């Protein structure tokens, strides 16, 4: 019965001696610093060299993730994607309108070349004939103008020779009989007979006018 307390005291001493080395191993007073890398330390806590492999890998992963989220379609609609779709739809609509306008212009061009050009050639030939008639008419008008100018010269000359008395007054003077005593001999030379100028004939320039019935 006396060995019980002694055995208990011995066991407590052994457990205390075993606990001291374990506590020294975990305490900071032992002089040994743990070289193990904490799992909580981040990638920016690495004090290795700059050209160490895998140093920029987290940055590259984050950049790739950002580009992927911007380019790849996501579950919900994104504002920039919707704006890009709207601009593409508007551009396609304008391209369709431009293509339709080109088709219309091409059709109009073929219509003009196929039908308009022959009609223009025919009208050009007709206009050349009309221009020839206009030239002939201008020459005819110039000839009439010269004839009228000659007639005006002869009328002015006749008025100067015969006087400007009215025709009725001259007839009245010619009807009055004057005695032979009061008649005087002609003082000047006798006037030559009147010769009318040569005028144009309308039939020479317009052949069909002579065949028309006179009204």
From Swiss-Prot:
Annotated tissue distribution: Widely expressed.
Coiled-coil positions: 80-97, 134-165
GO CC terms in record: axon cytoplasm; BLOC-1 complex; cytoplasm
Phosphothreonine carried by residues: 164
InterPro entries: Cappuccino (IPR024857)
Main location: cytoplasm
Subunit structure, interactors included: Octamer composed of one copy each BLOC1S1, BLOC1S2, BLOC1S3, BLOC1S4, BLOC1S5, BLOC1S6, DTNBP1/BLOC1S7 and SNAPIN/BLOC1S8. Component of the biogenesis of lysosome-related organelles complex 1 (BLOC-1) composed of BLOC1S1, BLOC1S2, BLOC1S3, BLOC1S4, BLOC1S5, BLOC1S6, DTNBP1/BLOC1S7 and SNAPIN/BLOC1S8. The BLOC-1 complex associates with the AP-3 protein complex and membrane protein cargos. Interacts with BLOC1S5 and BLOC1S6.
Disease: Defects in Cno are the cause of the cappuccino (Cno) mutant, which is characterized by a severe oculocutaneous albinism due to abnormal melanosome formation, and prolonged bleeding due to deficiency of platelet dense body contents.
Annotated function: Component of the BLOC-1 complex, a complex that is required for normal biogenesis of lysosome-related organelles (LRO), such as platelet dense granules and melanosomes. In concert with the AP-3 complex, the BLOC-1 complex is required to target membrane protein cargos into vesicles assembled at cell bodies for delivery into neurites and nerve terminals. The BLOC-1 complex, in association with SNARE proteins, is also proposed to be involved in neurite extension. Plays a role in intracellular vesicle trafficking.
Designated name of the protein: Biogenesis of lysosome-related organelles complex 1 subunit 4
Organism this protein belongs to: Mus musculus (Mouse)
Source lineage: Eukaryota, Metazoa, Chordata, Craniata, Vertebrata
Protein encoded by which gene: Bloc1s4
């Amino acid at each position: 019965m006396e060995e019980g307390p002694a055995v208990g005291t011995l066991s407590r001493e052994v457990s205390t001696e075993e606990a001291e080395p374990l506590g020294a191993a975990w305490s900071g007073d032992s002089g040994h610093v743990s070289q193990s890398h904490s799992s909580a330390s981040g990638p920016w806590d690495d004090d290795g060299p700059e050209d160490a492999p895998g140093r920029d890998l987290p940055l590259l992963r984050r950049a790739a993730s950002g580009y992927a989220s911007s380019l790849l379609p996501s579950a919900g609609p994104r504002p920039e994607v919707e704006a890009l779709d709207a601009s593409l739809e508007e551009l396609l609509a304008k391209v369709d309108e431009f293509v339709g306008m080109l088709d219309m212009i091409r059709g109009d061009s073929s219509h003009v070349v196929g039908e308009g050009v022959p009609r223009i050639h025919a009208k050009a030939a007709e206009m050349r004939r009309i221009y020839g008639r206009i030239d002939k008419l201008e020459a005819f008008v110039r000839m009439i103008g010269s004839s009228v100018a000659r007639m005006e010269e002869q009328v002015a000359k006749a008025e100067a020779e015969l006087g400007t008395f009215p025709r009725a007054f001259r007839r009245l003077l010619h009807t009055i009989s004057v005695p032979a005593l009061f008649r005087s001999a002609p003082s000047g030379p006798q006037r030559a007979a009147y010769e009318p100028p040569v005028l144009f004939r309308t039939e020479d320039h317009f052949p069909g006018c002579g065949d028309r019935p006179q009204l």
